[in-house]
From Swiss-Prot:
Residues 80-176 form the Toprim domain. Belongs to the RecR family. SUPFAM superfamilies: Recombination protein RecR (SSF111304). Pfam families: RecR_C, RecR_HhH, RecR_ZnF, Toprim_4. The gene is recR. This is Recombination protein RecR. May play a role in DNA repair. It seems to be involved in an RecBC-independent recombinational process of DNA repair. It may act with RecF and RecO. One of its GO terms (molecular function) is zinc ion binding. Keywords: DNA damage, DNA recombination, DNA repair, Metal-binding, Zinc, Zinc-finger.
């Protein structure tokens, strides 16, 4: 049976989200149709507002309403350390821990030759430029996920940064192989930051 075009379009739209297959997208589409009109309107407004009002910080690449972001503008942050993460969700996870007080740099991905992602496809050049311009930075803490792509990205960044004399460290692996930072509990993250090792 074919669904009416508006439902089919809604299903297709939900399937564009990561991890959402046809069955889940269909369930979400019908759930949306059962929602109150006001709730659907608020949901649509929230999507449009997020797309319109958010951008990436020109310094660290984190998602923000203001440029530069609040973290980059905060003079109380430790200006000597930059924690390099894969995406903005990782920044949120680290901030919830409330134990790391340095700066961040968001890569927006990892090196993945299988997916055609090279160094030019992620935010590495901006990191190198930032390190050259800001002599206050003394340590780069690499916090990419414990996946083969995350490890390859960490090694690549380490090779580029080390010749500059800046200390390069890697989060300790209380994080199990294949795990994502955004899903780690706060104690695990705290121990990973505290136990970081030099690369």
């Amino acid at each position: 049976m074919q669904y009416p075009e508006p439902i089919a379009k809604l299903i297709d739209s939900f399937m564009k989200l990561p991890g959402i297959g046809y069955k889940t997208a269909t369930r979400l589409a019908f759930f949306t149709l059962d929602m109150e009109k006001d709730d659907v309107t608020e949901f649509a407004k929230a999507l449009i507002s997020a797309q319109r009002d958010l951008s990436f910080c020109s310094i660290c690449g984190n998602i923000t309403e203001d440029d530069p972001c609040d973290i980059c503008q905060d003079p109380s942050r430790d200006q000597k350390a930059v924690l390099v993460v894969e995406d903005s969700k990782d920044v949120m996870s680290m901030e919830q821990m409330k134990e790391y007080h340095g700066l961040y740099h968001v890569l927006h991905g990892v090196l993945s030759p299988m997916d055609g992602k090279g160094p030019e496809d992620i935010n590495i050049a901006a990191l190198l430029t930032r390190l050259q311009k800001n002599e206050a930075i003394k340590e780069v803490i690499i916090a990419t996920n414990a996946t083969p792509e995350g490890e390859a990205t960490a090694m690549y960044i380490s090779r580029l940064v080390k010749p500059s004399g800046i200390k390069v460290t890697r989060l300790a692996h209380g994080l199990s192989v294949g795990s994502d930072i955004e899903y780690a509990d706060q104690m695990t993250l705290y121990k990973a930051v505290e136990g970081r090792t030099e690369m």
